[in-house]
Amino acid sequence: MAPKGSERTVKKVVAENRKARFNYEIVDTYEAGLVLTGTEVKSLREGKANIAESYATDEGGEIWLINSYLPEYLQANRFNHETRRRRKLLLSKREVNRLQGAVNREGMSLIPLRIYFNERGRVKLELALGKGKKLHDKRETSKERDWNRQKNRLLKERG
């Protein structure tokens, strides 16, 4: 157990959507729980998951994670889970209403950024509210990243 004064925020990241920050302008992020079966949690503990092509949508007052890939748990018997099933996200009613309003009114998207285990061992999903970037915005981001890399190289040489 950690000492009382120290704040420990250890997050074991299982899956990350690395393209999301390049393809979308992130406005806000939320932490959501996931409704999972036992074999899905065991599969996540092995560190095998993919959320690169997944997205979230609102249906019937609830937020669902769609097209996320959690491979079958190899040690499970015939009661294994489906790899690409829809998974319910656990958010407060206020957060659900806020997300639904932003998606419906402002045309924003719900993008899963990463799946991780929090310090209590619970599976969490970092969900982002974002707007899709245009092609010229993506080019600008790429140029800015290249310039920062080059600038750091020059500063390192001058020392």
Swiss-Prot record:
Subcellular location: Cytoplasm
Protein name (database record): SsrA-binding protein
Keyword Metal-binding: no
One matching Pfam family: SmpB
Cellular component GO terms held in the UniProt record: cytosol
Example GO molecular function: RNA binding
PANTHER family: SSRA-BINDING PROTEIN, TMRNA-BINDING COMPONENT OF TRANS-TRANSLATION TAGGING COMPLEX
GO biological process, one term: trans-translation
Amino acid composition bias (Basic and acidic residues), ranges on this chain: 137-159
Gene3D superfamilies: 2.40.280.10
Record's keyword annotation contains Cytoplasm: yes
SUPFAM superfamilies: Small protein B (SmpB)
Domain of life: Bacteria
Role: Required for rescue of stalled ribosomes mediated by trans-translation. Binds to transfer-messenger RNA (tmRNA), required for stable association of tmRNA with ribosomes. tmRNA and SmpB together mimic tRNA shape, replacing the anticodon stem-loop with SmpB. tmRNA is encoded by the ssrA gene; the 2 termini fold to resemble tRNA(Ala) and it encodes a 'tag peptide', a short internal open reading frame. During trans-translation Ala-aminoacylated tmRNA acts like a tRNA, entering the A-site of stalled ribosomes, displacing the stalled mRNA.
Family in the record: Belongs to the SmpB family.
Region annotation (Disordered) ranges: 134-159
Protein keywords: Cytoplasm, RNA-binding
